[in-house]
UniProtKB/Swiss-Prot annotation:
It is an enzyme of class 5 (isomerase). It catalyses: [protein]-peptidylproline (omega=180) = [protein]-peptidylproline (omega=0). Coiled coil: none annotated. Consists of 3 domains; the N-terminus binds the ribosome, the middle domain has PPIase activity, while the C-terminus has intrinsic chaperone activity on its own. Keywords: Cell cycle, Cell division, Chaperone, Cytoplasm, Isomerase, Rotamase. It is found in: Cytoplasm. Pfam families: Trigger_C (PF05698), Trigger_N (PF05697). SUPFAM superfamilies: FKBP-like, Triger factor/SurA peptide-binding domain-like, Trigger factor ribosome-binding domain. Its EC number is 5.2.1.8. This is Trigger factor. Belongs to the FKBP-type PPIase family. Tig subfamily. Residues 157-242 form the PPIase FKBP-type domain.
Length: 430
């Protein structure tokens, strides 16, 4: 195989290679003969379709498929021959002839010796208590609460239906009329000063509040200004929580309505949530230590740029889903994404290097356990398991996640670590 490699940057390489034409023709010819034996075409007996007809019908497709497969095979072979370790996907362009190609790609940087025993990691521990289960049941009651109108002044926990309008200098918002809405006091949904201003208001009462909005407030006309906000309580309602009886318990999928089974199911769900939260904390701990130890290593620029683009696209999507305008993202936010992306790439490459150098292998048992854990959050877990097993992309993502967790655990076990006990609530507050 003809292939040559050259460095075009600290971490960028250019590989020029030529496809073996005879192998391509052999593959194409073999595939066409196979189609001639198996393809049914009207007017011809099975297995008797002339090669010329097969060539006319399938030749272009067969040649394209063969070219794609041979291109990847030849490139991979050249990469192995030159002992290259790619960071990201290559860009492959046509060369001077139909069989000449030029691949441009980035390689994994040299991290030198990776000694994880010098890292200091805090491993957090926590457990689910009966009090945590009681609190979750209380939260479930809050989810099913109803509202009863009252004549007294509003207090924390009440639902207040309100009308508002604001005066920012010479500008009135809205220009005419009022804005309507509702908020549960203490929920943090509204601006804190407005929520506190609503406390004590009874149905029909109004108040003018002087509010200092921060410079980054989401409404440009109010940002950084002292604004007169006029509020009126249209209605005040107090919450009515349901009793924890059989009907309530059955509504959460416990067919028997048994209270002990209900608590057992809640414990299982909380323990699953806790396990994920503790792993996220450990992942962050290990990641921060790796970043601090290897921040001096240059990262592949294109890989970082791609990661930053993915992070920006994710934020835009999240803002659209929540009804916010992506235009609110500051113009200078790009550098922030680049910095975060560089750290994410650094940790990802280091995790891969640790796995490779220490010959860590994906544990199929752990993959199955994680899949069962994911599936248990759905009403039809067996269908979810089957969906994963039949979708290579989903399964690949799951395997990557499990492999990363294996490496994180491996690093934490060998690093200098201390244990810190947390309450359940503190542990899940990542």
């Amino acid at each position: 195989m003809q292939a040559s490699i050259e460095s075009t940057g600290n971490l960028e390489r250019r590989l020029t290679f030529t496809l073996p034409q005879e192998r391509l023709e052999t593959h194409v010819g073999g595939r066409l003969r196979e189609l001639a034996r198996t393809t049914r075409i009207k007017g011809f007996r099975p297995g008797k379709v002339p090669t010329k007809v097969i060539e006319q019908r399938f030749g272009q497709q067969v040649r394209a498929e063969a070219m794609e497969g041979l291109l990847r095979e030849t490139f991979d072979s050249a990469v192995r021959e030159h002992s290259l370790r790619l960071a990201g996907n290559p860009r492959i362009d046509q060369g001077e002839s139909d069989f000449d190609f030029v691949a441009t790609f980035e390689v994994v940087p040299d991290f030198g010796d990776i000694d994880v025993t010098n890292l200091s990691v805090v491993r957090h521990t926590a457990e689910v208590t009966d009090a945590d289960i009681d609190q979750m049941i209380e939260n479930l009651r809050l989810q099913r609460r109803t509202w009863n109108p009252v004549e007294r002044g509003a207090q924390v926990g009440d639902l207040v239906a309100l009308e508002t309008w604001s005066q920012a200098g010479n500008e009135r918002l809205p220009a005419e009329g009022v804005e309507t809405g509702s908020s549960v006091l203490g929920s943090g949904v509204m601006f804190d000063q407005i929520e506190k201003g609503l406390e004590g208001l009874s149905k029909g009462e109004d108040k003018a509040l002087s509010i200092d909005f921060p410079a980054d407030w989401r409404v440009p006309q109010l940002a950084g200004k002292t604004v007169q906000v006029h509020v009126k309580a249209v209605e005040v309602s107090e919450p009515v929580l349901p009793e924890v009886n059989k009907e309530f318990i059955k509504s959460f999928g416990v067919k028997s309505g048994d209270a002990e089974q209900f608590r057992a199911d809640i414990r299982t769900n909380l323990e699953r949530e806790l396990k994920g939260a503790l792993m996220n904390r450990l992942r962050r701990e290990v990641g921060e230590q790796l970043i601090a130890a290897y921040a001096h290593v240059e990262m592949p620029p294109r890989l970082v740029e791609n990661e930053a683009g993915s992070m920006l696209a994710q934020q835009v999507d999240q803002m659209r889903r929540s009804g916010r305008n992506p235009g609110e993202i500051p113009a200078d936010a790009h550098q922030g994404f680049m910095d975060a992306a560089a750290k994410r790439v650094l940790v990802g490459l280091l995790v891969g290097e640790v796995a490779r150098r220490n010959e860590l292998r994906l544990e199929s048992k752990r993959v199955s356990e994680t899949l069962r854990l994911i599936a248990s959050t759905y009403e039809e877990p067996e269908q979810v398991i089957e969906m994963y097993r039949n979708d290579p992309q989903l399964m690949s993502g799951l395997q990557s996640r499990v492999m990363e967790e294996q490496v994180i655990d491996w690093i934490a076990e060998r690093a200098k670590h201390t244990e810190q006990s947390l309450s359940f609530q503190d542990a899940i507050r990542v």
